[in-house]
Design a protein with these regions (language model features):
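A glycine-rich, hydrophobic/aromatic-adjacent loop/helix-cap motif
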Residues: 1-204
Length: 204
């Protein structure tokens, strides 16, 4: 959808936007009728890997964000969607709190003015108890890094790794048999790049 048409559509009061900083940066993982997305930067949040014992039957770590210093900046994707899809989005982001953010917290990369609609970001709830070491599914990480590659180039992938805390979490190499439900297909060059930038990680 063209930007002018989106702004006009927003006046109807049935649109929302949410900031993606992990798998949502990759449009191939979107499962609702998304209208539009824009590269954006969120101020005042940090990203890290977080144990998620509440998800599925295996001890996975997923990306989370949390409010932090106003000096902290996250690159990501601002996704414009219908407000009626919020229940589906909340279901996808099970175990995350949907936080409201303001236009002052968000900056589009081409300096477009944001329409007056509700703006959100999802922040993972801290687990009450962690009984075992958790790991990162490579199929999940691939989806995230492909999103950053397509939106921000190779530098964006490297910045994602450098600016995400707890990347010492171990990797579970499931690329050949993906366990992440919204896994993506990679080109040979993407596989090479992603393996290169994560070569420091230990595997389980």
């Amino acid at each position: 959808m063209e930007w002018e048409a989106l702004v006009e559509r927003a006046r109807g009061g049935d649109l929302i936007a949410y900031f993606g900083y992990g798998s949502l940066v990759n449009p191939a993982t979107h499962r609702t009728n998304v209208l539009h997305y824009e590269r954006a930067q969120l101020r005042g949040f940090k990203r890290s890997w977080q144990e998620r014992p509440d998800v599925g039957t295996e001890p996975v770590a997923l990306l989370s964000s949390a409010p932090s210093s106003r000096d902290d900046l996250l690159d990501g994707l601002l996704v414009f969607d219908f407000s009626e899809n919020l229940p589906l989005l909340d279901e996808r982001e099970y175990g995350y709190d949907r936080l409201s953010v303001t236009p002052e917290d968000l900056k589009l990369y081409d300096d477009k003015a944001l329409p007056e609609i509700p703006l959100y970001v999802y922040s993972g709830r801290l687990p009450q108890k962690v009984d075992a070491p958790h790991y990162i599914l490579q199929s999940y990480l691939d989806a995230v890094m492909q999103g950053y590659l397509h939106q921000y180039g190779e530098e964006g992938v490297r910045n994602f790794v450098e600016r995400t805390a707890r990347f010492d979490t171990k990797l579970f190499a499931d690329r050949a048999s993906p366990r992440y439900p919204r896994y993506v297909s990679l080109s040979e060059s993407e596989q090479y790049l992603f393996d290169q930038v994560t070569s420091f990680m230990s595997t389980v």
